[in-house]
Swiss-Prot record:
<dbReference type="GO" id="GO:0032009">
    <property type="term" value="C:early phagosome"/>
</dbReference>
<dbReference type="GO" id="GO:0051453">
    <property type="term" value="P:regulation of intracellular pH"/>
</dbReference>
<dbReference type="GO" id="GO:0015385">
    <property type="term" value="F:sodium:proton antiporter activity"/>
</dbReference>
<feature type="transmembrane region" description="Helical; Name=12">
    <location>
        <begin position="430"/>
        <end position="450"/>
    </location>
</feature>
<feature type="transmembrane region" description="Helical; Name=9">
    <location>
        <begin position="323"/>
        <end position="343"/>
    </location>
</feature>
<feature type="transmembrane region" description="Helical; Name=3">
    <location>
        <begin position="127"/>
        <end position="147"/>
    </location>
</feature>
<feature type="topological domain" description="Cytoplasmic">
    <location>
        <begin position="225"/>
        <end position="235"/>
    </location>
</feature>
<keyword id="KW-0406">Ion transport</keyword>
<feature type="transmembrane region" description="Helical; Name=4">
    <location>
        <begin position="165"/>
        <end position="185"/>
    </location>
</feature>
<keyword id="KW-0968">Cytoplasmic vesicle</keyword>
<feature type="transmembrane region" description="Helical; Name=7">
    <location>
        <begin position="278"/>
        <end position="298"/>
    </location>
</feature>
<keyword id="KW-0967">Endosome</keyword>
<feature type="topological domain" description="Lumenal">
    <location>
        <begin position="186"/>
        <end position="203"/>
    </location>
</feature>
<keyword id="KW-1268">Autism spectrum disorder</keyword>
<keyword id="KW-0160">Chromosomal rearrangement</keyword>
<keyword id="KW-0472">Membrane</keyword>
<dbReference type="InterPro" id="IPR004709">
    <property type="entry name" value="NaH_exchanger"/>
</dbReference>
Length: 645
């Protein structure tokens, strides 16, 4: 008997390993098909179905095959055994079965309605991912790549609008979706489709927070291929990047909302506690990600890792990943931390990397982003058939479709109207219509929904989220090109050309600045930050910028010499790069270092304003909603700076 049980155990273990290999083989096969399909689409300029939509189609087909072509097994019989001596759920449990001791580990709590009295399907159960895989493995490279590849010039040019859409717009979407869904839930209770008390207002707000996470990856990919107007691209890209971070923290804050008396009633103290949690988690995650990027910048600056590009790239990757893990370990949000880590790495650390490491890091995270995105979208297709606890409710699904469109309209149009009151370059109606159209749901909404599917309301949310992702990716993603034509939005704009950092073009832009942009207070704040960053942060963290011996007081001489790299002194003689900073009085050329660098001819900087007409299609680096007021610019020498654009 003992031998038989041991043989059965070894057989079960072999079967488990076999199922794991099948699971990996399925995803490997799906990715191969997706890559070949992407090549086919790009070769034939087929834009009505994007690669993400194709990945979902392949996932659906594979899920359909696994669902109906595999036989059910007895490994999940649904039988419940009572342990009357246990009063809690231990993390590890030793069970004596016929004098044979077995070890079991805690997996999750299961609601009564999730216990299936019939046979289960081992393959389908195996194909259902642990939700933490999405947050700990697949999402971090996607979010980091978004921050690391950020086009900083256009992003900061529209920073005010992006922050407004990301923070205020996400809050508006969450509230509007929550209110509409609460009305539909009441209708479902009245129709007898739900029991009173099964679905609370906090559940509706939770659904609103996860559905407020937009992910227009399909639209942005088409924008990039068609070279759509850079302002529209930046508004959508910037909103989606920050919106993901805000939605994740907002979802967590709502999930821990717990009034003292009635758990489903409004409690002002609990509400403000949730707001405080939101602000604290967001700020802490921002600080954590930025801190790791600063550590990476200092290590790459003061060591000679640049002589070993492989080690340099490895250190860069591991420290960036550590930002995510440290934030999660500290009870913060790793997604927010890794986003701002990527932005800070691009702004500082990238300048210290060797040329090989610059190429390797960009290609590494681009590749990881590509694989992770396609794995997620393939799994979305699979999940429609492999997830065994779907709850389809037509009224709830109809309400969700209506809610996301109304919420998107309440987000885009009123906020655009308010922003246009302070912007010189208005957000035109066709841009607003395109932003309304581009409110797709994707990886973040799906990952938030699948993270908790134990209760019936959460299962209904997950099923509805999955259908919404399918619809928006296929319909809106496929209709992007016709919509661009119908709205007469310009395409064929070379975004990279607009982002080139050459002295003559920047000086031409500076000579043609409009003096009446937006409010002067914003300009003063931005000018203070830029000056502080240029004079102190970049010289401390990178090899670029003026030597600290010229910017810090004399009594800081030892610290200045310690923190200033030898390259900064060498680059002090060069005038290869000119960068614009704000000056309140007049537009002038600053030659503070000219005494030590007599080889810098003024004519090379283009002092004759008449000889520097503005190049058509060039946008002013600072024009937008940062609020420069009537201030003008001053050109200051930047010492050998190399930025990631």
């Amino acid at each position: 008997m003992e031998r038989q049980s041991r043989v059965m155990s070894e057989k079960d273990e072999y079967q488990f390993q076999h199922q794991g290999a099948v699971e990996l083989l399925v995803f490997n096969f799906l990715l191969i098909l997706t890559i070949l399909t992407i090549w086919l689409f790009k070769n034939h300029r087929f834009r009505f179905l994007h690669e993400t939509g194709g990945a979902m189609v392949y996932g659906l087909i594979m899920g359909l095959i696994l669902r109906y072509a595999t036989a059910p097994t007895d490994i999940e019989s649904g039988t419940v055994y009572d342990c009357v001596k246990l009063t809690f759920s231990p993390s590890t449990l030793l069970v004596n079965i016929t004098d044979q001791v077995y070890e079991y580990k805690y997996k999750r709590e299961i609601s009564q309605h999730n216990i299936n009295p019939h046979q289960g399907n081992a393959i389908l159960e195996k194909m259902t991912f642990d939700p933490e895989i999405f947050f700990n493995v697949l999402l971090p490279p996607i979010i980091f790549h978004a921050g690391y590849s950020l086009k900083k010039r256009h992003f900061f040019q529209n920073l005010g609008s992006i922050l407004t859409y990301a923070f205020l717009g996400t809050a508006i979407s969450c509230i509007v979706i929550g209110l509409i869904m609460y009305g539909f839930v009441k209708a479902m209770i009245h129709a007898g489709q739900l029991k009173n008390g099964d679905f609370h207002f906090t559940d509706c707000l939770f659904f609103g927070s996860l559905m407020s996470a937009t992910d227009p990856v399909t639209v942005l990919a088409i924008f990039h291929e068609l070279h759509v107007d850079p302002d529209l691209y930046t508004l959508l890209f910037g909103e989606s990047v920050l919106n993901d971070a805000v939605a994740i923290v907002l979802t967590y804050s709502i999930s821990i909302y717990s009034p003292k008396e009635n758990p489903n009633a409004f409690d002002a103290a609990a509400f403000f506690q949730s707001v405080g949690n939101f602000l604290g988690i967001f700020a802490g995650s921002f600080a954590m990600g930025s801190a790791y990027a600063i550590i990476t910048a200092l290590l790459t600056k003061f060591t000679k890792l640049c002589e070993f590009p492989m080690l340099e790239t490895g250190l860069f990757f591991l420290l960036s990943w550590s930002a995510f893990l440290s934030a999660e370990a500290a009870g913060l949000t790793g997604i927010v931390a890794v986003l701002f880590c990527g932005v800070t790495q691009a702004h500082y650390t990238y300048n210290n990397l060797s040329s090989d490491s610059k190429i390797r890091t960009k290609q590494l995270f681009e590749f990881m982003n590509f694989l992770a995105e396609n794995v997620i979208f393939c799994y979305m297709g699979l999940a429609l058939f492999t997830f065994q606890n779907h709850i389809f409710n037509a009224l709830f699904i109809l309400g969700a479709f209506l809610a996301i469109f109304v919420a998107r309209a309440c987000n885009i149009y009123p906020l655009s109207f308010l922003l246009n009151l302070g912007r010189k370059q208005k957000i035109p109606w066709n841009f607003q219509h395109m932003m309304m159209f581009s409110g797709l749901r994707g990886a973040i909404a799906f990952a938030l929904a699948i993270r908790n599917t134990e209760s019936q309301p959460k299962q209904m949310m997950f099923t509805t989220t999955l259908l919404l992702v399918f619809f928006t990716v296929w319909v809106f993603g496929g209709g992007t090109t016709p919509m661009l034509t119908w709205l007469q939005i310009r395409v064929g704009v070379d975004l990279d050309e607009n982002l080139k950092e050459d002295p003559s073009s920047q000086h031409q832009e500076a000579n043609n600045l409009d003096k009446n942009m937006t409010k002067a207070e914003s300009a003063r704040l931005f000018r203070m930050w830029y000056s502080f960053d240029h004079k102190y942060l970049k010289p401390i963290l990178t090899h670029s910028g003026p030597p600290l011996t010229t910017t810090l007081p004399e009594w800081c001489g030892p610290i200045s010499r310690l923190l200033t790299s030898p390259q900064a002194y060498g680059e002090q003689l060069k005038e290869d790069d000119v960068e614009c900073i704000v000056n309140q009085d007049e537009l002038a050329i600053n030659y503070q270092e000219q005494a030590s660098s007599p080889c810098s001819p003024p004519a090379r900087l283009g002092l004759d304003q008449k000889a520097s007409p503005q190049t058509p299609g060039k946008e002013n680096i600072y024009e937008g909603d940062l609020g420069l007021g009537g201030y003008e610019l001053k050109l200051e020498q930047t010492l050998g700076q190399s930025q990631l654009n």
